[in-house]
UniProtKB/Swiss-Prot annotation:
One of its GO terms (cellular component) is chloroplast. It comes from the Eukaryota. Mg(2+) binds at K192, D194, E195. The keyword Lyase applies. It comes from Lupinus angustifolius (Narrow-leaved blue lupine). This is Ribulose bisphosphate carboxylase large chain. GO terms for biological process: photorespiration; reductive pentose-phosphate cycle. The basic functional RuBisCO is composed of a large chain homodimer in a 'head-to-tail' conformation. In form I RuBisCO this homodimer is arranged in a barrel-like tetramer with the small subunits forming a tetrameric 'cap' on each end of the 'barrel'.
Length: 455
């Protein structure tokens, strides 16, 4: 017969290749696949590989003009999920040529762009990605990273302390700056714009930036410590976002902030490049992450969003608390915390890490624990997150019965007590409450905080 063999054919003939040996340059993905009833797992896994790479629903004439073997995604392994009927982990390898260099946006458009609406699947979740060295090297990554940040701030050997200014909406710029000053003066390292503070009618961005800068210079002069306030540069357009970052730089402040999921990866990478070029640290908030990562069987796990952020660029990122008001299992959380901070992370399924990830000296990101935490949580947080982290107490600072500055004092005293106890070899997990109680004997501010929030 003339021409090519037209018609719909099974994906698994082309895209399910259990003998395939993965290459060092491949991007590897682990998908949790829930096929529709009657769809075999091989076909579902192959369909994912096809739809997220070169495949389309029918054979097309132009297939003959490409080298499919060079460009197709391959489902190379399938395993059942323990304890779940009809769920499988499908491992897919993508050739590096399918992706634009230095573009998280393109990486996600390819891997998770179309395939999640696929009819043959009831649900699909991207659990993990292995980013090959060759691709990592096309990204700038975090503007500065953990070590450079410590050097800029001159703060070593302990976690950093932050506080989100509340009420998050409705304060005037002057009163907002006042709250910032009180917290920093009391002993915090950072204060933070809430993620939804951008530039609203009750407080325009330029006024807020000005009063916050005034607050942090005053606090710096009085405490002899370097202080920061995360000025949220997130805006409706990239141009406006950069304009805000430029103004922050002109004020001489150390750090700005961005909501990377609502702002988008393209905007985030642009801001990250600007921050590295101009010596600004970049704090990242993950507003909207639960829309993507909360469902256990559909969407994307946060560890994928965290890896993507490390590529796109950010010096801090919110990553759950393990102890506060928002959910997060301890081992899983520590898994992606390591993926953010460490240079090399071994595959470890008990911590949700499906692939060994080598970051080839891309700078690390500080995880930020934030949400419903207070002084009694301090020993656990110090133990779980270690020194390279930012602990953020919003209500846990501003809710102090004596006011903001004493709230900040209470947190700083609690932190210093925990760090000292740890350095003396005491066990924070078992003696935590004891350590806080001892410290509160000589700090009335901490004692008052201990009264308000029970253990």
């Amino acid at each position: 017969s003339v021409g090519f063999k037209a018609g719909v054919k099974d994906y698994k003939l082309t895209y399910y290749t259990p003998d395939y040996k993965t290459k060092d340059t491949d991007i590897l993905a682990a998908f949790r696949v829930t096929p529709q009833p009657g769809v075999p797992p091989e076909e579902a896994g192959a369909a994912v590989a096809a739809e997220s790479s070169t495949g389309t629903w029918t054979t097309v004439w132009t297939d003959g003009l490409t080298s499919l073997d060079r460009y197709k995604g391959r489902c190379y392994h399938i395993e059942p999920v323990a304890g779940e009927e009809s769920q499988f982990i499908a491992y897919v390898a993508y050739p590096l040529d399918l992706f634009e260099e230095g573009s998280v946006t393109n990486m996600f458009t390819s891997i998770v762009g179309n395939v999640f609406g696929f009819k043959a699947l009831r649900a699909l979740r991207l659990e993990d990605l292995r980013i090959p060295n060759a691709y990592v090297k096309t990204f700038q990554g975090p503007p500065h990273g953990i070590q450079v940040e410590r050097d800029k701030l001159n703060k070593y050997g302990r976690p950093l302390l932050g506080c989100t200014i509340k009420p998050k909406l409705g304060l005037s710029a002057k009163n907002y700056g006042r709250a910032v000053y009180e917290c920093l003066r009391g002993g915090l390292d950072f204060t933070k714009d809430d993620e939804n503070v951008n530039s609203q009618p009750f407080m325009r961005w330029r006024d807020r930036f000005l009063f916050c800068a005034e607050a942090l210079y005053k606090a710096q002069a009085e405490t002899g410590e370097i202080k920061g306030h995360y000025l949220n540069a997130t805006a409706g357009t990239c141009e406006e976002m950069i304009k805000r970052a430029v103004f922050a730089r002109e004020l001489g402040v150390p750090i700005v902030m961005h909501d990377y999921l609502t702002g988008g990866f393209t905007a985030n990478t642009s801001l990250s490049h600007y921050c590295r070029d101009n010596g600004l640290l970049l704090h990242i908030h993950r507003a909207m992450h639960a829309v993507i990562d909360r469902q256990k069987n559909h969407g994307m796990h946060f560890r994928v969003l965290a890896k993507a952020l490390r590529l796109s660029g950010g010096d801090h990122i919110h990553s759950g608390t393990v102890v506060g008001k928002l959910e997060g299992e301890r081992e899983i959380t520590l898994g992606f915390v390591d993926l953010l901070r460490d240079d090399f992370v071994e595959k470890d399924r008990s911590r949700g890490i499906y692939f060994t990830q080598d970051w080839v000296s891309l700078p690390g990101v500080l995880p930020v624990a934030s949400g419903g935490i207070h002084v009694w949580h301090m020993p656990a947080l110090t133990e779980i997150f270690g020194d390279d982290s930012v602990l953020q107490f919003g209500g846990g600072t501003l809710g102090h019965p004596w006011g903001n500055a004493p709230g900040a004092v209470a947190n700083r005293v609690a932190l210093e007590a925990c760090v000292q106890a740890r350095n003396e070899g005491r066990d924070l997990a078992s003696e935590g409450n004891q350590i806080i109680r001892e410290a509160s004997k000589w700090s009335p501010e901490l004692a008052a905080a201990c009264e308000v929030w029970k253990e």
